[in-house]
Amino acid sequence: MHRYRSHNCAALRKHDVGKHVRLSGWVHRVRDHGGILFVDLRDHFGITQIVANPASPAFEIIEKVRSEWVIRVDGEVCARSDEVINTVLPTGEIEIFVKEVEILSKSDELPLPVFGEPDYPEDIRLKYRFLDLRRETMHKNIMRRTEIITAIRRSMQNNGFTEFTTPLLTASSPEGARDFLVPSRIHQGKFYALPQAPQQYKQLLMMSGFDRYFQIAPCFRDEDPRADRLPGEFYQLDVEMSFVEQEDVFVTMEPIMRSIFEEFANGKPVTQNFPRISYDEAIKKYGSDKPDLRNPIIMQDVSQHFYDSCFKIFAQILTNDENAQVWAIPAKTGGSRAFCDRMNLWAQSEGQPGLGYIFWREEEGKFEGAGPIAKNIGEQRTEALRIQLGLESGDACFFIAGNPKKFSTFAGAVRTRIGEELDLIDRECFSLAWIVDFPFFEWNEDEKKLDFAHNPFSMPQGGKNALECQDPLTLKAFQYDLVCNGYEIASGGIRNHSPEMMLKVFNLAGLSREVVEDRFGALYRAFHYGAPPHGGMAAGVDRIIMLLQGVKNLREIALFPMNQQALDLLMSAPSDVSSAQLRDLGIRVAPAAKNGS
């Protein structure tokens, strides 16, 4: 018999009754029922119940074991009586009457419980992550993560993609966040950078004559953490294809993404044909470029009802600013003064002056609007608003006025808040859509210059002619995002493969030819030697797994994550290094940095 086990702790069934077996694992819990000891023995695969009575030669040792000790047991498989069968466990019809026990490893007093999975402070969980990962939910999360990544790889390979591994030590380049820098010992005073994304490498693979690339790529960005973004390191499904247009990417990647969601959605419906929504439409209807389409609320421009109205606040805003609009945010079933007042208080807590609103009631077969706005704009305009918005008795609507560029984000937050408060959001589905036609540039008011709105390597719609003839702020890019349930889960684009257009695009953003050649020299050179049209995308693996597992925090689906302060509490990183190491690198740490100031 094997030194440690003949079976794992999930393998034995009723047909194994009578067998002499050997199991090894962790003591999940111990129970004493009338002098008979019951031990739940746990390993990676599951749990088997071990039984020891006072007559067993192993009883004296079993009495001593405690939670999370590691033991080996030898014994006989016996059938449980019908009244004590555990239908929750696959092994619930049997138990092992123990004959021999060996203690393989003892455990100190636990800093957090493994059995029962109560809430526990996150910093303790991260410091003792090896214990946290023994808990059933966390263990399942990590195994599901592996299953999803395996399914992604299989699907990509089945669709003709080849997996390549790109370097982790590269040159620093601006990708929208700070780089993690790695000092060079051989070339003192110079630094490598960990890649924020394999953007240039994957494009260079297309220059190298490869056709369809993918990689589950580690990416490193020194940015502030959020619940839906891990500090430091994250993983993305990186994809690039040669000789493609935007539609080719959609036709190829949409079935792959849909199949992954369907395989791991636990029966929840998944969008079959992903709608294409322009960036401008997404902002106007949903107040976000990553709309949650499970929320049925669609915002509308209702400015025409407020021009020259007696609701002077909105009328003056429209008169004083030609770009001003009034947006309506319908709230089906929200037609009570209490709810409207609650929303108003919430808006004020968000730093806003408040929310205008109307709610409707039906009196003697006639709809009546209530609230300050209805009182000021009159019955005719109030009814016209109700008809346009498709509202009924018991419904409400909230209003925001001003320049949409300034209030659209808040309007989107109002839409989300209403959907959550009124339970309008369908929590039992995955709603996916492509967001397309992103603006190429945006205006940086602080620096009085153009910035890239998205990826600087994308192809401008209209090509070279548009670059030369159009107002840069009206340019659209062949740039797209894939969104799901209010999260951006992928981003991509058709790439610019012309060196002349590359220079023109970066010149518009204030970067000279010399800067482009310095920061993106490899890509710029490659464009001079026969560059194929190409495009692709990158999908956030961690975020997709988070959605499929139904958790709110990425740390729940990552093995050894940092905390919110970008500290690795398990490995005590970042850490001090020795003076000798610093001397080898030609680095001296400033006194202020040593003191943490």
Curated annotation (Swiss-Prot):
Keyword annotations: Aminoacyl-tRNA synthetase, ATP-binding, Cytoplasm, Ligase, Nucleotide-binding, Protein biosynthesis
Domain of life: Bacteria
Binding-site residues for ATP, renumbered to this chain: 221-223, 488, 540-543
EC number: 6.1.1.23
Catalytic activity: tRNA(Asx) + L-aspartate + ATP = L-aspartyl-tRNA(Asx) + AMP + diphosphate
Region described as Aspartate: spans on this chain: 199-202
GO MF annotations, alphabetized: aspartate-tRNA ligase activity; aspartate-tRNA(Asn) ligase activity; ATP binding; nucleic acid binding
GO terms of biological process kind: aspartyl-tRNA aminoacylation
Binding site for L-aspartate: 175, 221, 454, 495
Site positions per UniProt: Important for tRNA non-discrimination: 33
Pfam families found in the cross-reference section: GAD, tRNA-synt_2, tRNA_anti-codon
Broad enzyme group: ligase
Cellular component, GO annotation: cytoplasm
SUPFAM superfamilies: Class II aaRS and biotin synthetases, GAD domain-like, Nucleic acid-binding proteins
Stored PROSITE patterns: AA_TRNA_LIGASE_II (PS50862)
Subcellular location: Cytoplasm
Homology family: Belongs to the class-II aminoacyl-tRNA synthetase family. Type 1 subfamily.
Role, per record: Aspartyl-tRNA synthetase with relaxed tRNA specificity since it is able to aspartylate not only its cognate tRNA(Asp) but also tRNA(Asn). Reaction proceeds in two steps: L-aspartate is first activated by ATP to form Asp-AMP and then transferred to the acceptor end of tRNA(Asp/Asn).
Quaternary assembly: Homodimer.
Protein name: Aspartate--tRNA(Asp/Asn) ligase
Origin species: Bartonella quintana (strain Toulouse) (Rochalimaea quintana)
